[in-house]
């Protein structure tokens, strides 16, 4: 966005048998073994792993890396071939053996095009998502319009795009920068079936999001003078329902335009949030809970732990 003038894991349950001592324990073992042989009764199988997990077990290094474990490719979508938004670029994992993937659309900010947030496309896709960085109908579209366009792009992605067979249409999210971040909030409020929302240094005149039901990570920038956190990101976060899975991450010393270039802090927490809630991948909970401490890159972090989703 250019400057605004105003604006189950495998932990299956098993029945515990009280510990027996001496000959009683041995006798019990013989009886149980005999029963298993004569009746064909076997121990319960462990619960299946989360079917939506994609990729190896995450580490700090893997979520901070500029690329993940999946090779990716792209599809260019012309604005002339779609309606309701301005086209864009789809980034997707090329594998056909890992099942379907969750998907998300990312919207740019005021006066900006998809190029301003393009770095997030391959970065997130290589971690196991189908990612659609979009252009808006006009670069001056306001947040409510950008929200509708995010939803239109998701509908195209899951219903008409050439990669639709690679997508699980029940696992979708939205991300956006500045007015695109405002659009992210608008889209999440309009479509509560979304699994995750991440507004990045968002700008919106609406400050009350108490009816929003989608797990939301609000990312603000400490030195933002376009959408100051005191009047944008913090009120957005505090207005979200206290029972909602929500978090507020503030980038230390960063400007409004921090999301327009590769940023490790933005990437690692956006990825962790999307994995945790779009994929229900609790392997990523460790990076979100306990609440991350302030650091050289984080000036504030708030949230509710543990997460409900």
Swiss-Prot record:
The enzyme's E.C. designation: 3.1.1.74, 3.1.1.1, 3.1.1.3
Enzyme class name: hydrolase
Localization (cell): Secreted
Signal peptide: 1-47
pH dependency: Optimum pH is 8.0 with p-nitrophenyl palmitate (p-NPP) as substrate. At pH 7 and 9 displays around 90% of relative activity. Stable at pH range 6-9 retaining over 95% of relative activity after 24 hours. Stable even in acidic pH of 2-4 with more than 50% of residual activity after 24 hours.
S-S pairs: 289-305
Activity regulation description: No effect on activity by SDS or chelating agents ethylenediaminetetraacetic acid (EDTA) or sodium citrate. No effect on activity by metal ions Ag(+), Ba(2+), Ca(2+), Co(2+), Cu(2+), Mn(2+), Ni(2+), Pb(2+) or Zn(2+). Activated by 1 mM digitonin and sodium deoxycholate, and reducing agents 1 mM 1,4-dithiothreitol, beta-mercaptoethanol and ascorbic acid. Activated by benzene, n-hexane, p-xylene and toluene. Activated by Fe(3+). Inhibited slightly by 1 mM of different chain length fatty acids, and only marginally by 6.0 M urea.
Catalytic activity: a carboxylic ester + H2O = an alcohol + a carboxylate + H(+); a triacylglycerol + H2O = a diacylglycerol + a fatty acid + H(+); 1,2,3-tri-(9Z-octadecenoyl)-glycerol + H2O = di-(9Z)-octadecenoylglycerol + (9Z)-octadecenoate + H(+); (6-hydroxyhexanoyl)(n) + H2O = (6-hydroxyhexanoyl)(n-1) + 6-hydroxyhexanoate + H(+)
GO molecular function: carboxylesterase activity; cutinase activity; triacylglycerol lipase activity
The keyword Signal is annotated on this UniProt entry: yes
Keywords, ordered alphabetically: Disulfide bond, Hydrolase, Lipid degradation, Lipid metabolism, Secreted, Serine esterase, Signal
Stored Pfam families: PETase
Temperature-related properties: Optimum temperature is 60 degrees Celsius with p-nitrophenyl palmitate (p-NPP) as substrate. Hydrolyzes p-NPP in the broad temperature range of 20-80 degrees Celsius. Highly thermostable. Stable at 50-60 degrees Celsius retaining 90-100% of activity after 3 hours. Has a half-life of over 30 minutes at 70 degrees Celsius.
SUPFAM superfamilies the UniProt entry points to: alpha/beta-Hydrolases
GO biological process, one term: medium-chain fatty acid catabolic process
Active-site residues, Swiss-Prot/TrEMBL: 178, 224, 256
Any Gene Ontology CC annotation: extracellular region
Main location class: secreted
Free-text biotechnology note from the record: May have potential in biocatalytic synthesis of esters by reverse hydrolysis, particularly in production of industrially important flavor and fragrance ester isoamyl acetate. After 72 hours of reaction, a yield of 34.4% and 16.2% of isoamyl acetate is achieved using Celite-immobilized and free enzyme, respectively.
Task of the protein: Catalyzes the hydrolysis of cutin, a polyester that forms the structure of plant cuticle. Shows esterase activity towards p-nitrophenol-linked aliphatic esters (pNP-aliphatic esters). Active with p-nitrophenyl palmitate (p-NPP) as substrate. Hydrolyzes triacylglycerol substrates non-specifically with a preference for long, unsaturated fatty acyl chains with the highest activity for triolein. Substrates with cis-9 unsaturation are preferred over the saturated triacylglycerols.
Family per record: Belongs to the AB hydrolase superfamily.
Name the record gives this protein: Cutinase
Provenance organism: Amycolatopsis mediterranei (strain S699) (Nocardia mediterranei)
């Amino acid at each position: 966005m250019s400057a605004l003038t105003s604006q189950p894991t495998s932990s299956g349950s098993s029945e515990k048998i009280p510990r027996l001592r001496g000959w009683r324990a041995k006798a019990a073992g013989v009886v149980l073994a005999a029963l298993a042989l004569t009746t064909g009764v076997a121990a319960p199988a462990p619960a299946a792993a989360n079917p939506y997990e994609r990729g190896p077990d995450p580490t700090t290094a893997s979520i901070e890396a500029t690329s993940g474990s999946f090779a990716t490719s792209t599809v260019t979508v012309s604005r002339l071939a779609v309606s309701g938004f301005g086209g864009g670029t789809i980034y997707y994992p090329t594998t056909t053996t890992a099942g379907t993937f969750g998907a998300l659309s990312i919207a740019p900010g005021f006066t900006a095009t998809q190029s301003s947030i393009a770095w997030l496309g391959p970065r997130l896709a290589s971690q196991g998502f189908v990612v659609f960085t979009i252009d808006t109908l006009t670069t001056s579209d306001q947040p409510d319009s950008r929200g509708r366009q995010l939803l239109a792009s998701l509908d195209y992605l899951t219903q008409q795009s050439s990669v639709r067979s690679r997508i699980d249409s029940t696992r979708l999210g939205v991300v956006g920068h500045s007015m695109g971040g405002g659009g992210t909030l608008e889209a999440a409020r309009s479509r509560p079936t979304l699994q995750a929302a991440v507004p990045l240094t968002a700008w919106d005149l609406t400050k009350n999001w108490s009816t929003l039901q989608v797990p939301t990570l609000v990312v603000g920038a400490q030195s933002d003078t376009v959408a100051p956190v005191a009047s944008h990101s913090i009120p957005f976060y505090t207005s979200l329902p206290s029972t909602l899975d929500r978090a507020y991450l503030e980038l230390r010393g960063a400007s409004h335009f921090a999301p327009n270039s590769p940023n490790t802090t933005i990437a690692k927490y956006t990825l962790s949030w999307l994995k945790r809630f779009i994929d229900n991948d609790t392997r990523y909970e460790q990076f979100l809970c306990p609440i991350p401490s302030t650091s050289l890159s984080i000036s504030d972090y708030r949230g509710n732990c543990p997460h409900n989703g």
